[in-house]
């Protein structure tokens, strides 16, 4: 199973937001961190399915080290929580076909 790094933004008085640096437009939210991460797993699966159905490729995940070296992502990695969200390999195989 492949895992994507997700940025979990938790601010007092706001919903918890989750986004994926490697997957533009793939976002989720929830009232709690656990709920937001659960929703992120669902969002990732739906996002990947839409990409496959649209004939588009799914970008490979970067490692945490690679993301830390990205000047656009590094500040968010330092400020927010990070989670690894799984994507079934079957979706990646379909994307490659």
Annotated model-derived regions:
Residues 4-6, 33:
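Short, charged low-complexity linear motifs
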Residues 8-23:
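Short aromatic-glycine-(Arg/Gly/Cys) micro-motifs in beta-strand/loop hairpins
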Residues 1-4, 39-97:
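Short, charged, surface-exposed hinge/linker loops at domain edges
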Residues 24-35:
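A short, exposed loop/beta-hairpin motif centered on an aromatic-Gly-Thr core
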Residues 21, 26, 51:
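Short glycine- and Lys/Arg-enriched binding-loop motifs that mark or flank ligand-binding interfaces
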Residues 18, 27, 82-85:
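Hydrophobic aliphatic residue packing
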Residues 4, 16, 26-28:
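Structural detector for hydrophobic anchor residues on beta-strands
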